[in-house]
């Protein structure tokens, strides 16, 4: 009704317009427009939105926002797409993982665990030269995982296109069907990242990657179990982790 008033037409005209655009109704059109605007918000605009949060309620607001993102991701995620991503990764000769800017921690997390599960995992580096040097080697027997959320990293999208042109399968981890990753990926896994500030909410994407890693580990159970036993021996021999009884932990605080 408010949109009709603003543009000087009736509510029924707005509904017919939404239907003519291919939407089931105005609410669906409204949601699509909101998503489009959200993707285009600059960091400063996102920060201004955060100013509406009361300072004494920041903790609860942000945590509730992250919980909502995880819940919505759980409800919306396609099990079929998730299963297909698992199969593509299991069939790959080599796996390339790429995520830049705020998505870099997600890509690093995924790459770390994929290297425990698979022998051939390449983390595509962040410098311009190294990015294209790595991606140029991708072949039709490989799989690339591109991770990016608003505002999308141009180089990630470009490298996904190169991988696709080289015949590789491409998996996108992003926020929705309007993402540029959806255009190039063979399969996309969507996670909600609605933010309460200029900071990207990575709670749902991280949970999604957790699920992907666990699914892969269960399919490679025997190989992974043997590798972890060998690694534990090396880790213990070289003191990779601080032991609970290590004096470096210090005395417990009263």
What is each model feature region?
Residues 2-80:
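HTH-adjacent hinge/linker in prokaryotic transcriptional regulators
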Residues 32, 36, 88, 231:
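Short acidic/histidine-centered micro-motifs embedded in hydrophobic/aromatic stretches
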Residues 80-87:
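A short, basic/flexible loop-to-alpha-helix module at the beginning of a structural domain
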Residues 87-208, 213-220:
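Glycine-rich phosphate-binding loops that contact phosphosugars or nucleotide phosphates
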Residues 222-254:
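A short, charged, Gly/Pro-tolerant segment at domain boundaries
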């Amino acid at each position: 009704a408010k949109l009709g008033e603003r543009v000087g037409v009736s509510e029924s005209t707005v509904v017919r317009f939404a239907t003519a655009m291919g939407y089931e109704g105005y609410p669906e059109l409204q949601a699509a427009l909101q998503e489009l605007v959200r993707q285009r918000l600059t960091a400063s605009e996102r920060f201004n939105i955060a100013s509406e949060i009361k300072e004494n309620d920041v903790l609860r607001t942000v945590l509730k926002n992250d919980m909502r993102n995880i819940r919505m991701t759980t409800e919306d995620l396609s099990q079929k797409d998730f299963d297909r991503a698992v199969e593509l990764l299991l069939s790959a000769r080599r796996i390339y993982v790429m995520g830049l800017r705020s998505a870099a921690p997600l890509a690093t997390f995924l790459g770390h665990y994929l290297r425990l599960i698979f022998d051939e995992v390449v983390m595509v580096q962040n410098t311009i030269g190294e990015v294209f040097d790595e991606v140029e080697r991708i072949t039709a027997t490989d799989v690339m995982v591109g991770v990016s959320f608003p505002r999308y990293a141009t180089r990630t999208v470009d490298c996904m296109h190169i991988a696709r042109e080289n015949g590789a399968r491409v998996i996108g981890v992003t926020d929705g069907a309007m993402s540029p990753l959806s255009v190039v990926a063979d399969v996309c896994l969507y996670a909600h990242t609605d933010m309460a500030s200029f900071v990207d909410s990575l709670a749902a994407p991280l949970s999604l990657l957790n699920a992907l890693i666990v699914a892969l580990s269960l399919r490679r159970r025997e190989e992974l179990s043997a590798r972890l036993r060998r690694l534990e021996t090396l880790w213990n021999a070289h003191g990779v982790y601080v032991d609970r009884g290590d004096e470096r932990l210090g005395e417990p605080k009263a």
